[in-house]
A protein has these predicted regions:
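A short beta-strand-turn-helix
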Residues: 1-18
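Flexible loop/turn segments at secondary-structure boundaries
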Residues: 6-7, 28-29, 59-62, 82-84, ...
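Active-site acidic short loop of glycosyltransferases
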Residues: 14-15, 46, 91-94
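Conserved redox-active cysteine motifs that mediate thiol-disulfide chemistry
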Residues: 17-39
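Hydrophobic beta-strand anchors of alpha/beta hydrolase catalytic cores
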Residues: 19-20, 51, 97
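Structural microenvironment flanking redox-active thiols in thiol-disulfide oxidoreductases
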Residues: 31-68, 80-86
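Short acidic-hydrophobic, aromatic-tinged amphipathic segments that line or gate anion-handling sites
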Residues: 73-78, 110
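Thiol/disulfide oxidoreductase modules built on the thioredoxin-like
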Residues: 81-123
Length: 124
């Protein structure tokens, strides 16, 4: 994570609804998407929502600067577009968003960000 710790998904997911996001902070859509996530995090964190954001950015310094003020868990895969983790989730393009239920089951691959809040509420 941005503090130099190895933060595993399992350490934040236990008993929580988790939004997993594969992203690239250098992309032009990233700030708007993070604002949307911020709104959702503010509204639903107390109800059990966690966000686990995986950056595939090449530039570690840019990533640290972009992620340092975000309240959720932000990690970076140094393999970037060759990420084995992204391959496990069949990520072909960014952003890629998934929702895990409180038992850690993958319940949704989000195709429409406009429906993200409804998708989260249905799992909370």
């Amino acid at each position: 994570d941005v503090h130099g710790e190895n933060t595993k998904l399992s350490s934040v997911a236990t008993g929580k609804v988790v939004l997993i996001n594969f992203t690239a902070y250098m992309s032009e859509w990233s700030p708007a998407l993070n604002m949307e996530f911020g709104d959702l995090y503010t509204r639903y964190h107390d109800k059990g929502l966690e966000i686990y954001q995986i950056s595939l950015d090449n530039d570690v310094h840019f990533w640290k600067n972009a992620a340092s003020n975000l309240p959720w868990t932000c990690v970076r895969d140094p393999q970037s577009v060759y990420s084995q983790t992204a391959a496990l989730y069949n990520v072909k393009q960014l952003p890629a968003i998934f929702i895990l239920d409180r038992k850690g089951n993958l319940v949704k691959r989000v195709d429409d960000v406009k429906k993200l809040e409804a998708d989260i509420k249905s799992v909370l």
